[in-house]
Every structure is written in C-alpha cells, then in structure tokens.
Swiss-Prot record:
This is Peptide deformylase. Removes the formyl group from the N-terminal Met of newly synthesized proteins. Requires at least a dipeptide for an efficient rate of reaction. N-terminal L-methionine is a prerequisite for activity but the enzyme has broad specificity at other positions. It catalyses: N-terminal N-formyl-L-methionyl-[peptide] + H2O = N-terminal L-methionyl-[peptide] + formate. GO terms for molecular function: metal ion binding; peptide deformylase activity. It comes from Klebsiella pneumoniae (strain 342). Binds 1 Fe(2+) ion. Its EC number is 3.5.1.88. InterPro entries: Peptide_deformylase, Peptide_deformylase_sf. Transmembrane segments: none annotated. The active site is at 134. Gene3D superfamilies: Peptide deformylase. Keywords: Hydrolase, Iron, Metal-binding, Protein biosynthesis. Fe cation binds at residues 91, 133, 137.
C-alpha cells in the first residue's frame, strides 16, 4: 500500500482522457488499494485514477462518516440521471477551493467492482454528486470547468500561490 502524489491544477495530465481497464488483475487491485490509501490520507471522499497520473477508468469513493464503506468503480458508465441539485464541491486536485456546481440529483451507473464483477448502482445525495464529480475526471473535466472564466482564473491563481508557498516550506 502506498500514498500516491495527487496532481494539482494547472497540470495538463488532469485533462487526459482515461482508457478503459482491459482486465481487472492484481496490478489493478493494487492501484485501487493505493488510491484508497491516498484518498484517506488526503481526507477526500473520492478519487479518480487520473488525479494520481494513472490514466485508466478507475474511481474510489467513500462518503461514509466512519470511512468503512468503500466503493470501487472500474470502467463506470452513466446509465441514467434525474433531477437537479448542487453543493459547494471541493477537489483534491484543486486544494482549499470550493464552488457550487450543478449536478443531477440521482444517477444510475454500471461498473466493475474490485474483483472485476459487473454491477449496477442507483445513487442520490452526496454519493450521486461524488460519482459525477469523479466520472468527470475520467474525461479530463474539472469542477472549475462549470464556472465562469473569471472564477476559474481566480481559483487557478490561488492554487498556484498555495503550491508555491508549500514548495518553500
């Protein structure tokens, strides 16, 4: 198990479209485990492989209070979405920044689990929002892409300043 480095904007690798996982094997399972370690270490609720410079369609999520409800989505597909909602979202790749993002209230997805078994899931609330957020990462999209150009620029400047301060520390 390992904690991986999370990419931050403006790193262009965050914009790369992830490739489907061809086979769920021990290497993919190790990536999943490392992604959970990374997500928990960074105090996140979701992480897409793209964020750790692995360009495969893998997502890990745990929105539970006790951090014991791991959800693995390999090659996720959005089947249905319904309603409208939105919360102030944050992102491990855009540290300490939040913004209101419009999302579907409910989603239905199909994916493979950690063992490569197919399943379908209907989700609402925070889980539905998190799934949509992480699936965006797999196609190179970030939550700031939903914002005005001015807000995007302000957030980028704040993150770049934060990264400069951290690199000096």
């Amino acid at each position: 198990m390992a904690v991986l480095q999370v990419l931050h904007i403006p790193d262009e690798r965050l914009r790369k479209v992830a490739e489907p996982v061809k086979e769920v094997n021990a290497e993919i399972q190790r990536i999943v485990d490392d992604m959970f370690d990374t997500m928990y270490a960074e105090e996140g609720i979701g992480l897409a492989a793209t964020q750790v410079d692995i360009h495969q369609r893998i997502i890990v999520i745990d929105v539970s209070e006790n951090r014991e409800e791991r959800l693995v989505l390999i090659n996720p597909e959005l089947l249905e979405k319904d309603g409208e909602t939105g919360i102030e979202e944050g992102c491990l790749s855009i540290p300490e920044q939040r913004a209101l993002v419009p999302r579907a209230e409910k989603v239905k997805i199909r994916a493979l689990d950690r063992d490569g078994k197919p399943f379908e899931l209907e989700a609402d609330g925070l889980l539905a929002i998190c799934i949509q957020h992480e699936m965006d990462h797999l196609v190179g999209k970030l939550f700031i892409d939903y914002l005005s150009p001015l807000k995007q620029q302000r957030i980028r400047q704040k993150v770049e300043k934060l990264d400069r301060l951290r690199s000096r520390a």
